[in-house]
């Protein structure tokens, strides 16, 4: 409960304020003191439109919070605080004070779902004190649909550092909640002991508190359907100063807690508990809430509460790239076939090509320099793949031992800069420990000094990194396109997974999927291997559906002649950066329709994972009555068609999306 003043609180508990004989004033004075103490240990904050509300209180000395939206419970009383090596901040806490404030800012940001963000939030800082009189601030910021909160600690006398041994931070969902979660992997499993790498399958609409596959809990972001509302839980602002976290398995009552990395990650090396210098702060934990999925898909909270850590050394340019490895695999990493993919990039008008793992042995550094020169002659720039590992997994691909320490890394980056290379794709991280977060940051900061962009693969999710690091241009952290080559199961599930990512993984940041596969069969000659189940227009739609500023598309030279001309023409023009994103319709795992704007051109794309054609009426206010737009669709035989569609009523644009098919409307 939240009360505006002491009188309101007193009346709630005791019915009325009455005049009393002197004898009874002592009793009422005692009751008033108890009520005053209760009032002093509660606080609340709402979003600017008052629909989202967070209540804070101390329950028997333990800090807890709860969340409602439109008066309906999203989170029941959930614990806060932590235990550290210098004191317990999760119990025996006392209320010291509270302070309210407002946060207003407008910022521009490339590489995310929109280019200009207006952030307005109400801020509440609650100051507590533990049994040893050590203070702790819990800072909450609420915008209309987003909550961000973190812990801020001062220096305690001469104690200028601390280790957080365990967080009490939790998220207690009502028992009727269903979940859309991906399990956290066991450490040191999978191919060459490279997990966890955020590449596990989601289970949709699962009952809350279902045990996770590995017993390690669930990765961020985590989506919850809470009655009439939806909630997305994640974190942002993680860098070298903390570990990355995930959710524990839930209690039977639906309480998920913040969990630190398994000690076995990184081959058992490095601490799984984070250390901080004081004064210091934890990362922001975020909760996005709405009565529908629109606030989830459109959220910018990962970027709203963080700031750039350094200036870009140059103006980084984003765009499209070819990539031989995805369709032609390891044998394609040779000089002659890289020439073919440079030529493909040139023919498509793409900005980049990616030379993948194995180049050091199969091509060699001298001939790599020749490739770089050839690419530049064709007006194509180059990304080069690197293995991140030093001593934490067995991944064999080269180039190895170039990114894991500063001396080797700077030497390598100096060579790449000299050769005119524009970026790196660094693979096989396999841990969320603070030491690994430091490696991510070191790679990014060193790369900026040499004018290099960075894509991470086999990695953790980004946590506000697009805003924090100006040369960061993508993370995999998803069951990406390579799995379509490896196993037919993932082709069978492709449409379903595509209808999850816009609601979960891609909501919180870049997702380097490496998609848009126009081969019917996933091998070099388009006549063997796994079979694509989705339509050509579905594949084209994912070029817009999946958001990442550098898109390594899975096209091959043969597609210039064996793919439909309309598909190649579309892929020559599709952009990779967006000024605006609008969610239109959908349900996780079933279908998704959204719109993105690049400059003054809109792209409305939809995909359908269901077994029947999907008829929709879309509200498309970006176009006026009488306008004509290009309409890509599948016919009943699943063949791609390009038509001109005249907008009769922008509020009711009728479309049909075929099973495992797609649509695109653009102008």
Segments (PLM) and residue ranges:
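Bacterial Sec-dependent N-terminal signal peptides
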Residues: 1-42
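C-terminal beta-strand-rich structural cap/linker in extracellular carbohydrate-active enzymes
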Residues: 645-667
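Carbohydrate-binding surface patches
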Residues: 587-625, 663-666
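An acidic-aromatic substrate-binding cleft motif
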Residues: 277-352
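Aromatic- and carboxylate-enriched substrate-binding clefts and catalytic-loop regions
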Residues: 354-535
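Conserved, mostly hydrophobic/aromatic
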Residues: 151, 345, 427, 454, ...
